[in-house]
Curated annotation (Swiss-Prot):
Gene: truA
Claim: Flavoprotein is one of the keywords in the record: no
Reported function: Formation of pseudouridine at positions 38, 39 and 40 in the anticodon stem and loop of transfer RNAs.
EC number: 5.4.99.12
Catalytic residues (positions): D28
Name of protein: tRNA pseudouridine synthase A
Broad class of enzyme this protein falls into: isomerase
Source organism of this protein record: Nanoarchaeum equitans (strain Kin4-M)
A GO CC annotation given for this chain: cytoplasm
InterPro entries documented for this protein: PsdUridine_synth_cat_dom_sf, PsdUridine_synth_TruA, PsdUridine_synth_TruA_a/b_dom, PsdUridine_synth_TruA_C
Keyword line: Isomerase, tRNA processing
Transmembrane segments: none
UniProt GO MF annotations: RNA binding; tRNA pseudouridine(38-40) synthase activity
Catalyzed reactions per annotation: uridine(38/39/40) in tRNA = pseudouridine(38/39/40) in tRNA
Length: 209
């Protein structure tokens, strides 16, 4: 089956609201896409910042890759103040943070997300009916003015990537202890991580046959 291939930048609505039909990935408002695929009727006039790149055949989607380009001066804004995991209190009070997150802590935290996990803590309630997802790759790179988070998975739940980013940054600022990280896939986080800013998130690649 042939799909239309699109590029778009920070749309002012979820892409499925702007162009109705079957999308391979239903990205949120302000989330950009280097490539996304659509099956259906294309409107005569495309929304602003949405570009049709062509057509490609798709038999099966193997995985999706997202990249989050986090400016260093926006890192603190992505923090989630996490209080409990299960019955364990991980932070009694808010702490003042400054500077940049610890890159080594963030990289170590990212390793724990690889594999088939229960991502109930990283989505909204209505998406938690089937919370099992497999993360194939999760890398973090430091550039001069920003960090690049690259995450590849077989599927992603609603808001999942943005909540993961907020959580990882919180680990980098020592808000959430690394020693309790595996519990987030077994016990309930209270509160759940907030959604990191969608403007820095890109759907980067659809791996397909």
């Amino acid at each position: 089956m042939y799909y239309y291939k699109f590029w778009y930048f920070r749309p002012n609505k979820a892409i499925a609201q702007l162009i109705k039909g079957k999308w391979i990935s239903r990205t949120d408002k302000y989330v950009s896409a280097r490539e996304n695929y659509f099956y259906g009727n294309i409107p005569k006039v495309l929304p602003k910042n949405v570009i049709l790149l062509g057509e490609e055949p798709i038999n099966k989607v193997l995985s999706k890759e997202y990249k989050y380009f986090l400016p260093k001066d926006k890192a603190i804004e992505q923090i989630s103040y996490l209080h409990k995991v299960g019955n364990i209190i991980v932070r009694k009070t808010k702490i003042k943070v400054k500077g940049l997150p610890n890159l080594d802590l963030m990289k170590e935290a990212a390793k724990h997300f690889i594999g088939k996990k229960d991502f109930t803590n990283f989505t909204i309630e209505r998406e938690a009916k089937n919370p099992l997802c497999t993360i194939i790759k999760f890398d973090i790179e430091e550039r001069k003015d920003y960090y690049v988070f690259s995450i590849v998975g077989d599927r992603f739940l609603y808001h999942m990537v943005r909540k993961i980013i907020s959580f990882i940054v919180s680990v980098g600022y020592k808000i959430y202890p690394l020693e309790y990280i595996d519990l987030v896939f077994k016990e309930r986080l209270n509160p759940k991580p907030k959604d990191a800013d969608p403007k820095f998130l890109w759907l980067w690649k659809i791996n397909k046959t």
